[in-house]
Amino acid sequence: MEKTRKFKFAMSRDGIIAYDRETPMTIRFTPEESNEMTKKIYDYTSMDYYCEVAHLEISNTCNMNCSYCYTGDKKGHELTTIEWRMIIDNLAKGGIFQVSFGGGEPTLRKDMFLLAQHVAHTGMNLGMTTNGMTLPAMTPDEKRSLKTYFKQINVSWHEDAKIVERALKVLKDFEIPAGINYAFSRTMQKDNEVVKELAKEYNAEVLYLVYKPIDLDFKEQVPADVVRDYAQKAANDRIKVAVDGPCVGQCLMKKKFIDVDSLGFVYPCSFVRKPLGNLLHSSFEAIWKSRGEQDECPFVKFEKEKVV
């Protein structure tokens, strides 16, 4: 018997959003489609945008030292398990659909699975971005826990195919949906075929990301339309692909996404480090309501929104 889907619904400036936690899948209805579905006329332009995703920097330590990391120096200052549980509850109460663990390196936290269990208890969906180094050394029970709690785990590409391959093998062996986060910089553009081959072999999705020059190394940035073309070619090669907002002319800052750092401060974007408030001191609803208008991105020049 086919399982009945249970959608969460939200009304936003763009229309009605339907989210299926199990898939996970998001269906977006235009204002016209939303009015037809509800048999009522709503003025969606008077509504606010709905925040769907929160990225949680649960760790401020890392076993790599990437110069392009958006969180900057890793000083090891982190919240306690209880404090992160409070933040997770705060986000769930605010209606967030999905959270993603990141860092730093999230797997370095000894309480990662306790936090993952708490996310599941709140009913939110959970993903993770990791550099993959620790996955092969996890115990069988820990690997099974990865499958239990995480809907998808993405391994970041840092020019070391062996690290990524070992991590992807763990995810494939335990039937955990996998992805490769591929920051498409000038330096890493050469790795495209290697990334695609790994994705094919391990049935992983490639997330093509426009490089954000946080160190003002704009020469490393490949234009968004070029990144999008590479993603399209990968899709034509029957590789599962996804792209970030800049690839399609969308900036999610203050519209659908927030980043929460290792001390509970909320940022409008992982790369724009201007705190909007702290989830240990304010409700998510209050922070979102007072966030103000979308700022101009200091790292990416957005083209007109595209459909791909």
Predicted feature locations:
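N-terminal pre-core extensions flanking Radical SAM catalytic domains
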Residues: 1-75, 256-257, 268-270, 283-306
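Short, acidic, Ser/Thr-enriched surface-loop or helix-capping motifs
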Residues: 260-261
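Radical SAM/AdoMet-radical enzyme domain recognition
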Residues: 81-102, 109-209
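C-terminal accessory region of radical SAM enzymes
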Residues: 220-248, 270-308
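A short acidic, helix-capping loop that chelates divalent metal ions and anchors anionic groups
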Residues: 74, 214-219
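Flexible, glycine- and charge-enriched loops at secondary-structure boundaries
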Residues: 76-84, 220
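Short loop/turn motifs at secondary-structure junctions and domain boundaries
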Residues: 48, 247-252
